[in-house]
Structure formats: structure tokens, C-alpha cells
Regions:
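Extracellular beta-sheet/turn segments enriched in Thr/Pro/Gly and aliphatic residues
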Residues: 159-200, 207-211, 314-351
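Bacterial Sec-dependent N-terminal signal peptides
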Residues: 16-43, 206, 325, 330, ...
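Bacterial N-terminal signal peptides
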Residues: 8-17
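Ser/Thr/Pro-rich, low-complexity mucin-like regions
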Residues: 199-201, 209-215, 285-315, 330-337, ...
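Solvent-exposed N-terminal domain segments of exported/luminal and surface proteins
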Residues: 24-152, 335, 515, 526-589, ...
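C-terminal, surface-exposed recognition/capping segments
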Residues: 505, 583, 592, 597-807
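Tryptophan-paired
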Residues: 65-150, 205-324
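Short, compositionally biased
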Residues: 294, 338, 342, 349-661, ...
Length: 807
């Protein structure tokens, strides 16, 4: 038979062609005591595509779509389709396998393979005789499978027979087909047999039209996604494939493309609007076309954009089944980037379609593309959250969804007090927040997903020229155990990969030039909260610093010491309901800094009458005198994924060392908050971890200096840089200074009054860990101009810089 081009399928597993000549009858897979009789087999191929006068198996699922339509936008027509098969090629039959099953017992009685000449639709075959009424299956264009199905095999198993297929053009392959006759009487019908064949694949054709009214859409990729790997030869009521059983077909990215694919009965639902056919609303394994490219509106800026077209019945928005012998013709006209069309995905996806989510997204401002998106229906990393630390008051399942209907800017920095970090923030119908970068080369912003006026969740956008998320610079840290010390739990020798700078900073370079030093500060976080606060905007020694230029959604400049509330104004409760109320307030008000109320020290709030909780969560008192810690304290311990090994007895460093990222973790995807022991190499003292002796500072030689005058701090001219440079591994500088980490004297925001304090005196970083079972404090790195404390403690209401470790 003449070999024809086969586009889109390649049978991988079962092409065992026997050495038969044209029209030669093959050798049957039969035991010797089964009698056979000659049969004249006649075949026809039921058309996949037909005209009014032609009947087809299921018909033409033709679909005309307009994607992302905006007012006044028109489109060019598609060119001639290339690379697909002609109708004759789609009908061609090269060879056949015949399988005869007895209806009484459902067992294989006989099988045979035969090759056919070009255009031949009849063949002289043999079938078993005298075995009663049978079902005869004919498989075409699949090679010789007779040795793959043993004599006596059950028909039920035969129906599960499948080949693995992949994308590509299979040279010399025609479309696999299947047909059968259920009532062949082997006693009387041996003279002839007629079987109609249908293709075991579906045909997907895309005709793409693009804008022609001044807008430009440049196609970079056209792919068919979620294609079933398995091609079942016989149609059955198979369930939808699993994710592991799916693959992707590529193309030559032209405007007219055809694929031939196995069926994928993904299912259906109640959708009625075609614009709602996007990932959150469709079966997870549904097959779809993904068109990616760059869209440039007339007079506008290019933006990355993707269009998704889910396959299914052309007249039913809720149908997502791709069935065999069916043609799916998609005539798609691109007419804009309207985000009210759920099939339109504007901007580069930072969240990998919701599979790589976090509370912080990092964007490289040197990228030519300025439009980005991330899935805004998932809280943080989507981790399962127990009711103990849930802002909803109940357990939150993993990857639970929220349902925003709009998005807004919360705050942003403006470079030079002019250039905005973001130019646009919006919410798309398909559950993404979309934003466009502003003119700032470095910046920070917080954006929120809302339902009406209520904030459901918010995210930190960190923009920088230094890297994107995949290029974040890290350094190796090693711990330095001093086991056997009183008051400290033993730790083990470990290594971490930690960011080389504070989260949100523009630089990690040690300096004492004001403009450059301010770039190293990053942003501040209260212990256990996911949302950042603006850092100091000065390089001076002050306890009431001005902050970097920051503006709210209305363009109003945010003043220092503003947008604050005492925790007692939220609630003075001390039970789980009160914890829920405070966590919910923090989530719904990401701009608001929550001050502590020291009146929570009284016995009425579970205090000892002397010591406040010093926490932004009211009445978070630790365990004391064999008394359990309060409910708020126990919740606060776990917000960032650490906790105490024993909430009654744990010593310092007796925390959960294996930090598990929570929905409140402020770090980007692939990173999480560090444990308390991460900085233990910063001192060399052997009898403790903390020291004020400069000879025990594990720093570069120039930083072995103390200035004990608090008002002077790092302004002292003997300090070469605005902070300290520590060795993260070993006791000396490695080649290239890769083990030297700079911690700037960025100060912090004070949890008592909200002032930005200790700028030029303290270099800090939060850990994820509470300090100990008897402490209300959180564990952190505490470095002043006169001491180094790798294992220190402080008020959890304070807001400090954060430096994340790689997962």
C-alpha cells in the first residue's frame, strides 16, 4: 500500500509487522484443533468529516470563538492549513488485525493479520468455524498485534488494549481505526463479513486569526495540552486519564494546525458561558489548545499573553470530552486582551498556573515584558492550615480557594519619590491578579484580592534589577553547635542556602554610602505576619526614622507612624475565637501595623501582673510555673511554621528545626522562613552563642569593633560599612567572598508605638521560631554596634527584616 504521511500520532509499542506480501493471508494465532473457514471481509471507513449527503459517526464539532474581544478590534483571516491529511489519507487502510471472540464465553477464538494494497477495501481472511455467535473486531493501521493477544484472552481485557502515543509526525503511518460486528454466526455466515471502521483518534484543527487594526499579536507557541498518552484501540466507557497519563503536543506555530489525538473523556459540567471555560472551572484533565505570544496594542506596550481553548462539543459550553472519529474545528479570532474573558491570560505567569504560589512574587525589572499575573484564588502557598492558626476559625484544606471579584493596590514604594513600582493592578475573570510594572527599577508593593471592599488576601511584589525568582542569589550557611550548654537545647550541624540580602531589598552589597545603604534594608515584618511594612529611608542614627517614599492606592503618601491600631481595639479575648478575630483582622488589613497593649499583663487576661505579652496578638503569654501557655501564645508560636518541641519545657534552641512553610510565610516560592540556629556560625565563642567580645565575632577583620555609645552606633567612622559582615561558613573569608554576608543596620519598627527605631544601631533578622517555652518572645538575629547575638529574643510585635532560606 502506498505510504501516506501521518501527522500528530506515532504508535510506539506494537508495530510487529509480519513478512506478508500484498494480499497475502497472514498466519492465524490459533491452536491446531480449531477449524477455520475462508471469509470475504469487506471494509469501509465511516467519514470523520462529511457533507449533507454523508453520514458521519458523531459529526463535526465546529466552534467559532472570539478571544479577548475589545471594542473596535478586528482580525485577519487565517491562511491555508498546512501539514494535515487529505480526506483520502484519513480514510486509507494499510493493514488489518482481525480478532474473533465467542459471545458465549467472551474468549478469543481466532486472530489474524493481513496487509492490504493501496485503496483495497476487501481481504480474504479465515475465521474459526463452529464456535457459535461471535463478535469480530477489526483493527486497522496498527501493525501486527496478533501475537500480543493470546488465544483464550477475555474480550474485556482486549477492550483495555492500548498503545502509548506521543507527539510528532509518524512516517508511513495512517490513522488507527477500529470496527466490529457483534452477531457473526460462525456456523452459517462464513461466506462474507462487512465491517465499518471508525478512527480511534479525534482530529483537532485550529484556524487562528490575529488583529489587523493597529494591534499586533506575535505567536510564540501553539500547543495542545492534556493530550491522552494512551490510545485505546476499542472504544469503551473509559474514565478520564490521570494527570500522569497526559502529555503535550507541540506544533510549528503557524495559524492553521491539525493534530490527531486519542480520545479523552474528561467529562462535563453545568457551564453555559464560553468565557468561563478556564482552569478553575473545567475538569483537571481536559484537553485544550494553548496559544502564547506577545500582544502589543496600538500605541501601547507589549505584554505576554496566552489564550486557552478547551475542546468539547461545539454547542455545549459545559462539555469537555474529546471522542474518537470526531473532528474538532476551532476558528479562533484574537481581538484583544479583555480580562473579562476567562480564556485570556494576560502577563507572564509567576505562579505556574497556581502550582507555585507564595505570598511574595519576585520580578526582574530588566525583562522586556512588563505585564505579569499570578493565581489569586490561593492563599500563600496553599498549605493545609489547622484551626489553631486559621484566620477563618476552622481548618483550611490544602489549596483551598477564595473567590475575589476585584483587586487593588494596597501600597507601593516610589523610586526617587516619583517613579511608581506598579502602573496597573487588576483582577481577571479566571482568578489571576494582573499587574503592570511602573517606571521604578527597584521597588516593593502590596496588592490585594478583594470581594467588594473586603480584602480576602494580599501579596508582596518585590521588583528588582538583580534577579527574578529563579535567579535569587543565595549563600551557604552552616550551623555551629555548642552542645551541652546550660539553658540551650542541643542542635546538629546543618547547612542552609540563604538569600544574600534582606527580602525586598535592592542590594546586598556592604556599603556606607547613604543611597546604597538604604537599598539594603528591604522591608519589615511583624512576627508571624505575611505582609511587609516599609523600612527606613535614611542612613542616620535615629529612633524615629522617616520611611522610604510610599503611597497608597489613592496616590496619597503614607506617613511614618501611621495606619496603626492597638490589638486591644480588635479584641481583648483570650480564647480561640479571639485568635481567629486577630488573625482575620491582620489578613483583611495588610496596611495596618498592629501595636501591642501592655495592659494584657493582668491576671484577667492570663498574665502574671508583671510581664506583658509584647505581642501583636493580645494576651499571648508563655508557659510559667507549670502552667500552660495561653491559647494566643500557642497559636503565635506556629504562624511561620516552626514551634517548640515541648511547649512547657523547651529550652532556647529547643524549637522545631524543620520549618514547614505556612500560608503566612512571607517568602517567595521555593523559600521559607529560617530556623533560629541558622546564624550560629556568626560567633566563635565556645561557652555560649552570644557575645560582646569582638575577638569572638566571626566577621571580617575590619568589623571586629565595638561602639558602645547607643547614640553613635554605626555612624562611628571606624565602621567601614553600615552594619556587619559575617562568615556564613568557616572562620575566614573564602575565595570570592562567597561566604561573607552583609547585615545592614536597618533598624526595625517598634511594636509599642510604631516608630522606626534603632536605625544605625541594630542589624536584625527574624527567625520562624519562638524563643523558648517560658518566653513570650520570638527568636531572631540581634546584632548591635556593641554585640553579636545569633540566638536572641525580642517582642513579637516588633517588625524586623527577613532573610529566607531555600526549601
Amino acid at each position: 500500500m502506498k505510504v501516506t504521511k501521518f501527522f500528530g500520532l506515532w504508535i510506539l509499542s506494537v508495530l510487529c509487522v509480519l513478512s506478508c506480501t500484498d494480499e497475502e493471508q497472514g498466519t492465524g494465532n490459533i491452536v491446531p484443533d480449531v477449524a477455520t473457514a475462508p471469509v470475504k471481509l469487506s471494509l469501509d471507513a465511516t467519514p470523520m468529516w462529511g457533507t449533507v449527503s454523508t453520514t458521519r459517526a458523531r459529526g463535526d464539532n465546529s466552534l467559532d470563538l472570539v478571544l479577548g474581544e475589545e471594542a473596535g478590534k478586528t482580525a485577519n483571516t487565517a491562511g491555508t492549513r498546512a501539514g494535515t491529511l487529505t480526506d483520502t489519507q484519513e480514510d486509507a487502510i494499510n493493514d488489518i488485525c482481525v480478532f474473533q471472540f465467542g459471545n458465549a464465553d467472551g474468549k478469543l477464538k481466532y486472530s489474524e493479520y493481513a496487509s492490504l494494497t493501496d485503496g483495497q477495501l476487501t481481504a480474504n481472511i479465515s475465521l474459526a468455524s463452529g464456535v457459535g455467535t461471535c463478535t469480530v473486531y477489526v483493527l486497522a493501521n496498527v501493525g501486527d498485534l496478533t501475537q500480543k493477544v493470546a488465544y483464550g484472552s477475555a474480550v474485556a481485557d482486549f477492550k483495555k488494549f492500548a498503545a502509548e502515543v506521543s507527539s510528532g509526525k509518524g512516517t508511513g503511518q495512517n490513522l488507527p481505526m477500529c470496527g466490529y460486528k457483534t452477531d457473526f454466526n460462525s456456523e452459517t455466515d462464513n461466506a462474507s463479513l462487512t465491517v465499518s471502521l471508525t478512527r480511534a483518534v479525534a482530529k483537532v484543527s485550529l484556524n487562528l486569526t490575529t488583529p489587523n487594526a493597529g494591534d499586533v499579536f506575535t505567536v510564540t507557541s501553539v500547543r495542545l495540552m492534556n493530550v491522552a498518552k494512551k490510545l485505546y484501540y476499542v472504544e469503551s466507557a473509559t474514565t478520564a486519564p490521570t494527570v500522569a497519563e497526559l502529555t503535550t503536543y507541540t506544533s510549528d506555530n503557524t495559524k492553521s494546525i491539525a493534530w490527531y489525538v486519542p480520545e479523552n473523556k474528561a467529562g462535563s459540567n453545568s457551564l453555559t458561558d464560553w468565557k468561563d471555560r478556564y482552569e478553575d472551572n473545567v475538569p483537571a484533565t481536559a484537553t485544550y489548545i494553548l496559544i502564547e505570544g506577545s500582544y502589543t496594542p496600538k500605541g501601547g506596550i507589549a505584554r505576554d499573553v496566552a489564550y486557552t481553548i478547551y475542546l468539547g462539543a461545539g454547542d455545549k459550553a459545559g462539555d469537555f470530552n474529546v471522542v474518537r472519529n470526531t473532528k474538532y474545528t476551532i476558528n479562533a479570532a484574537i481581538k484583544g486582551t479583555n480580562m473579562n474573558d476567562g480564556r485570556v491570560l494576560v502577563g507572564k505567569d509567576l505562579s505556574a498556573a497556581g502550582t507555585q504560589t507564595a505570598n511574595c512574587y519576585v520580578v526582574n525589572t530588566t525583562d522586556a515584558n512588563k505585564w505579569y499575573r499570578f493565581k489569586a484564588t490561593i492563599r500563600g502557598n496553599g498549605a493545609a492550615t489547622s484551626a489553631q492558626i486559621s484566620y477563618t476559625g476552622t481548618d483550611i484544606p490544602a489549596n483551598d480557594r477564595i473567590a475575589p471579584d476585584n483587586a487593588a493596590l494596597v501600597w507601593e514604594t516610589r523610586e526617587g519619590d516619583k517613579a511608581p513600582t506598579l502602573d496597573y493592578v487588576g483582577y481577571s475573570r479566571n482568578g489571576y491578579i494582573v499587574f503592570k510594572l511602573g517606571e521604578a527599577t527597584e521597588g516593593n508593593a502590596v496588592v490585594a484580592a478583594k470581594n467588594g471592599a473586603t480584602t480576602l488576601w494580599s501579596w508582596h511584589i518585590w521588583t528588582t534589577v538583580a534577579f527574578d525568582r529563579n535567579g535569587i542569589k543565595v549563600q551557604t550557611y552552616e550551623t555551629r553547635p555548642r552542645n551541652g550548654l546550660a539553658s540551650y537545647a542541643n542542635i546538629t550541624k546543618r547547612e542552609f542556602k540563604m538569600m544574600d540580602r534582606n527580602l525586598g531589598s535592592a542590594s546586598g552589597t556592604a556599603t556606607k554610602v547613604a543611597e546604597e545603604a538604604i537599598k539594603t534594608y528591604g522591608v519589615y515584618f511583624q512576627f508571624g505576619r505575611k505582609d511587609p511594612f516599609p523600612a527606613a529611608g535614611v542612613m542616620t542614627r535615629t529612633n524615629d526614622a522617616d520611611i522610604v517614599p510610599v503611597y497608597d492606592a489613592n496616590g496619597n503618601k503614607i506617613l511614618k507612624n501611621s495606619n496603626q491600631i492597638k490589638n486591644s481595639a480588635i479584641t481583648t479575648g483570650i480564647d480561640q475565637t479571639a485568635v481567629k478575630a486577630q488573625l482575620a483582622y491582620a489578613v483583611e488589613n495588610p496596611l495596618v501595623f498592629i501595636l501591642r497593649d501592655d495592659n494584657d499583663k493582668t491576671a484577667a487576661y492570663g498574665g502574671d501582673g508583671t510581664n506583658p505579652s509584647y505581642n501583636w496578638i493580645f494576651a499571648a503569654h508563655p508557659a510559667k510555673n507549670d502552667k500552660d501557655g495561653s491559647v494566643p501564645w500557642k497559636a503565635s508560636n506556629k504562624l511561620w511554621g516552626s514551634g517548640l518541641q515541648d511547649e512547657k519545657t523547651s529550652l532556647m534552641l529547643g524549637t522545631i528545626a524543620d520549618v514547614k512553610k505556612t500560608i503566612y510565610d512571607p517568602c517567595p516560592y521555593g523559600y521559607h522562613m529560617p530556623p533560629q540556629d541558622v546564624w550560629t556560625n556568626f560567633t566563635t565563642i565556645t561557652t555560649a552563642y552570644n557575645t560582646g567580645n569582638v575577638t569572638e565575632y566571626n566577621v571580617v577583620a575590619a568589623d571586629k569593633y565595638n561602639q558602645t555609645n547607643e547614640s553613635t552606633g554605626f555612624t562611628d567612622g571606624k565602621f567601614e560599612v553600615w552594619g556587619r559582615r559575617f562568615f556564613t561558613t568557616g572562620d575566614a573569608e573564602a575565595a570570592g567572598a562567597g561566604n561573607v554576608a552583609f547585615y545592614p543596620a536597618a533598624g526595625y519598627r517598634y511594636g509599642y508605638d510604631g516608630h522606626v527605631s534603632h536605625v544605625g544601631w541594630g542589624c536584625y533578622a527574624w527567625s520562624a521560631s519562638p524563643y523558648s517555652a517560658t518566653s513570650q518572645y520570638g527568636g531572631f538575629l540581634d546584632t548591635y554596634s556593641s554585640w553579636v547575638r545569633p540566638v536572641s529574643n525580642t517582642d513579637r510585635s516588633n517588625a524586623f527584616p527577613v532573610r529566607c532560606v531555600r526549601d
